[in-house]
UniProtKB/Swiss-Prot annotation:
Source species taxonomy: Eukaryota, Discoba, Jakobida, Histionina, Histionidae
NCBIfam families documented for this protein: tatC
Highest taxon in the source lineage: Eukaryota
InterPro entries: Sec-indep_translocase_CS (IPR019820), TatC (IPR002033)
Keyword Translocase listed: no
Family under the similarity heading: Belongs to the TatC family.
Organism of origin: Reclinomonas americana
Protein name: Uncharacterized tatC-like protein ymf16
Pfam families from the UniProt entry: TatC
Membrane topology: Multi-pass membrane protein
UniProt-annotated location(s): Mitochondrion membrane
GO MF annotations in UniProt: proton motive force dependent protein transmembrane transporter activity
Amino acid sequence: MLYNIPILTHLYEIRLRIIYLLYSIFLTCFCSYQYKEEIFYLLFIPLSKNFIYTDLIEAFITYIKLSIIVGIYLSYPIFLYQIWSFLIPGFFLYEKKLFRLLCLTSIFLYFLGSCIGYYLLFPIAFTFFLGFQKLGKDQLFTIELQAKIHEYLILNTKLIFSLSICFQLPVLILFLFKIYPKTYLWLIHKRRFIYLFFFILAAILSPPDILSQFILVIPLILFFEISLFCIKLIQKYNSFMEPIGFEPTASCLQSTRSTI
């Protein structure tokens, strides 16, 4: 049964969802701080260097930032769950299934991007940059890395979050197609420019060596093509269902919010 709900009720629910999310982030940050040394050890593994800090409170501030970053990073599934809980009453049955699939796919790709960065890009990037060291008696001068703990954390954070966001591309494309069906034709028409954008993005986010750039750009192109293939399947499904009176393209964005 559909009926209109006052806007204040929606605002109250949004406020409640935000509070739940903040509670989860705070709890995750607190737990992360209890295991700050173990988490930092995992971050240190790709570089395998000793670290220094040059400010009296730098190590403490770095631990605090680490806890906040981990709390935000691990709260992404909870963030999606809160969005799901708010939107689900206004969804049709097939939209519930589609949105559930998009959420699960988004979470999987979110952590997949981090794993690719940690296990593939980080070793390649650090090996490249460590190659600028000048060690040994046969060198004209000596250059040795003395990594600062805070700068290393910020660098890792930027890389991990950048990759996690980039890997949301399929979810973004499918969502845009749901809102604006002509997105598919536009993506097909602009495919060459999108590929060029992927290579530019890979050059910005990854080290300048070709291997690391291809490690980043190949998944982006693969996800892009898979997204287009999925859209094509959805279009065929819609064209099959429309003759029998079913309107699969109807959107909850144009409907009235309901209760279950």
